[in-house]
Amino acid sequence: MKSIFSVLFAFVVVVIACSCISCKSSRKSATEPDTVALVGPTFNADSAYAFCAKQCSFGPRLMNTEAHDKCGEWIMKQFVGYGMKVETQDAELKAWDGTMLRSRNIWARFRPELTTRILLCAHWDSRPWADNDPDSTNWRKPVMGANDGASGVAVMLELARVISSDSTLNIGVDFVCFDAEDYGVPQWSSAPDSQDSWALGAQYWAEHQPQGYEARYGVLLDMVGGEGARFYQESVSKQYASEIVNKVWRTASQIGYGSYFPMQEGGMITDDHVPVNEKAGIACIDIIPFYPDCQQSSFGPTWHTINDTMEHIDRATLKAVGQTMVQILYSEK
């Protein structure tokens, strides 16, 4: 899913690796938050896992396919069932290779009458090509996208389920499922790797906002179910929304999930939050894993491979992210 600002990212990784080793112990004692009591309902990791598996049961959600369209209908039906007001944003978007993509952004609104709103988002399409697979014979095969796609939507669906059954949340929440995120230029192509070839649905959403729409801030959930995932603080997020980064990472530590959210910087990522920040003007962070020691990819060993399947989805990771987001929402004033 994402493209990395490759040269800059490589430099950042080296700098971070060196600096974090030298300052880790002193930084921890200075910034470690106190423990706080849980607020809000319990996030059910088994339910989120089932939502992830259901999306995968349709097959890879590739653009312009029946599996993609059927999964989209199912996602909308789930949000409607939880009492959300659901709208779609349909568009024909031109891909890097000239292919016209039938894109559908799905927007589900909890308590749409409220003006104080938090934006949660994830992409729901899956990558057409396993172009980072260690076996080159798999490079043109589709990716299931259990983590890279389904996991973020699964967490949002479980959040929608638990807040819809609870009457104490007094803010509005917008759940946006972005389409056409993962159709960026493949590594095997001779075409230049344009950053704009990624996050097409999010770009369209950001450029076609309803008049007067505002959100206090946004959180992008990307690849939030993987085994061994750790969510470092992404650089674009810190540039545009450092206060939100601090809030989320501090909250995770306060409720016992600090090991999943290290107080350390990760790379600079091209992802759906970039147009949300730059085009929509909504401060938005990206919760995305960073594997500094993974040779296959800093996004983890299954990223853009045929192994991005349910076998590598971890309920504990879903729980850490989901319960942190419950705490964030129910701590808003």
What function would you assign to each model-found segment?
Residues 1-36:
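Bacterial Sec-dependent N-terminal signal peptides
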Residues 25-71, 82, 295-312:
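N-terminal capping segment at the start of a domain
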Residues 34-42, 57-66, 93-96, 138-150, ...:
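Second-shell loop/turn segments in exported
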Residues 47-57, 70, 74-81, 151-158, ...:
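Extracytoplasmic/secreted proteins, especially bacterial periplasmic and envelope-associated proteins
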Residues 53-113:
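A non-catalytic alpha/beta surface segment that caps or lines the substrate-entry region
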Residues 62-63, 92-95, 113-114, 124-128, ...:
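Solvent-exposed loop/turn segments at secondary-structure junctions
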Residues 90, 217, 224-333:
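Active-site-adjacent substrate-binding region
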Residues 140-243, 268, 272:
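Acidic/histidine-rich catalytic neighborhood of metal-dependent amide-processing enzymes
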